[in-house]
Each structure stands twice: as C-alpha cells, then as structure tokens.
Regions:
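Positively charged n-region of N-terminal signal peptides that target proteins for export
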Residues: 1-5
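Bacterial N-terminal signal peptides
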Residues: 7-16
Length: 290
C-alpha cells in the first residue's frame, strides 16, 4: 500500500510538470481596429479528374488589398476548414489581414481546401474519407490535383502568381507531410512549406523522407517545421523523432529550414499561436527579391 500511495503521489506531483504549455495567441491573431478585412468565399469542388468521385469544400480568402491586375501570391492549406475557421487553431484570415496591413508579408490569397470524401451510394450511408490517400501517399498525385484540378478553378476568378517563390503550402499532421510532398514533387511550382506536427512516419511510407532528403540534391524549398515533445508514438512511428530526423536531414543537405520543438501534443495549439511568426519567416525576403 505504501508503494501505491507513494507512486500516486509521484504521479500527481509529476502531472503539473508535464502539463502542456498554455500557448497564447499574440495580437496578430485577433481582429484590430482600422485593419481592412478580407472576404472569405466558401465553394464546393466535385469534378476532380485526379480523384474521381470525390467532393470537397474549400474556401478562398481574398485580402482587401487584392488587385486583379497583379499576379498575387497564395498559400494552399490542407484540412482547410481548421485553418480558416474564426475559432480554429490558426485563425489564418485574421493573421493575413494584420500582417498584410502591416506590410510584413506580401498580399496573399488563401486557399483552404478540405480532403475529399466519396459520397455513399447507399441511402443514409456514410461517405468514404479520402484524406490519408491524398495526404500520406508519396507521389505526385496530390500535386497534380492542385495544379490540374483545383488551381485552374480558382484562377477563373483570381489572378494567381506563376512564380514558384510566391506559391506556398501549409498543413497539419498528414496535411503537413502532404504540403512537403507537393513541394518535393514540384519545386518548379511551390517553394514554401509550413508543417504543423507533420506525419513523417510510416503511415504510407513517409518515414523514408529523411533518407531521401540526404541522398537527393537539394531542392529550392524553404520549410518551417513545428513539432511537440508530447506528440504521437504509435505503430506508425514516433512523431517527435520523425520530425527531428527531418530537421537533421534538412540541415545536412543545406536546406533553408526552421525547426521549432514545443511540448505540445498532436494538435494545432502551438502551431496556431506561432503562425504569424511562421509567415514572417517563410516570406521574409519575398518583396526584397522582386
């Protein structure tokens, strides 16, 4: 009994120590008086050639400063609803409003796209989720979806830049590895990546990326990796270890990268609160280069 009581006491005293940090949003993640607000348009995409039969919601954020006569930078967010939601983990539209107004980042259109689902053919049946196939697979299929399916649809209404330095990607978990895969497959089209708690584990072979990065000539990609010490450890792999391996491989090969390790779990709390700084870093020299 004494051992049990002692163990319980140790556990109770240890829990506050390992409690996850209470990450706080900065003023950049809240609406500010006098800052022009962009508009958000919700759409549905249901005519994919790359993923036939899928249906997905997506949202377009258009900043107040958008000029249709100028090719405009853009960022594609995987699991888009989580990023665009007013009370989501990132509040990206508000952050865009503030940083664009402060001229800390270029004028950017946000494209927030959800993973596809395949509607059930049975009445009352549940749709089949296509997320892991789209996000965790290591090939060019999702990049082709963006380049051949979705972006041409967006370009019907908006003037998107063709400059790969102005085309960026962001995602969380499987969406994070997806963002990397798109840039890895098509660095001629996308060269900026932000990954929250990226799933560089063996869901569909993503654990191979560190070795691939080390053995492949450096590609012109800039990447920000965020991870948490208390992230997942399961049959697919260990997320903190996988992201450390990614960071080590990027360093070895000479990539322009930044790696931030917090103490968070498998969620967007840490990444969401530092998103403004992620944007500042990823876009830090874009206007100067123009």
């Amino acid at each position: 009994m004494k051992i049990l009581v002692t163990s319980f006491f140790i556990l109770c005293t240890f829990l506050p120590f390992v409690a996850l940090s209470d990450y706080k949003y900065t003023e950049d993640s809240f609406p500010k008086d006098g800052v022009p607000k962009g508009k958000i348009i919700k759409k549905v995409f249901a005519k994919s050639k790359i993923y036939p039969g899928t249906v997905r919601d997506y949202w377009i954020y258009v900043p107040d400063q958008y000029n249709s006569e100028k090719p405009t930078c853009f960022m594609v967010f995987q699991d888009g609803n989580w990023y665009q939601a007013a009370k989501g983990h990132t509040r990206a539209p508000v952050v865009f409003d503030n940083l664009i107004h402060q001229k800390e980042i270029p004028v950017i259109i946000g494209i927030f796209v959800n993973p596809g689902v395949i509607p059930s053919k049975k009445e009352g049946g549940k749709p089949r989720k296509n997320r892991s196939l789209e996000y965790d697979t290591l090939n060019d299929q999702y990049s082709r979806f963006l380049l051949e399916d979705l972006l041409p649809e967006v370009e019907k209404d908006y003037n998107l830049t063709k400059d790969p330095e102005g085309r960026s990607l962001c995602g969380i978990s499987s969406g994070g590895i997806c963002a990397w895969t798109v840039a890895w497959e098509r660095p001629d089209q996308f060269r900026k990546v932000i990954s929250y708690i990226g799933s560089f584990t063996n869901i569909r072979g993503g654990h191979a990326y560190p070795a691939m990065i080390r053995k492949t000539e450096k590609k012109p990609i800039r990447v920000f990796l965020q991870e948490g010490e208390n992230d997942l450890d399961n049959l697919h792999g260990n997320w903190p270890l996988a992201n450390r391996q990614m960071a080590a491989a990027l360093k070895f090969t000479g990539y322009d990268y930044k790696f931030v390790m917090g103490d968070g779990a498998h969620n967007g709390k840490h990444g969401g609160t530092i998103f403004p700084d992620m944007l500042r870093w990823i876009w830090r020299d874009y206007e100067k280069a123009k």
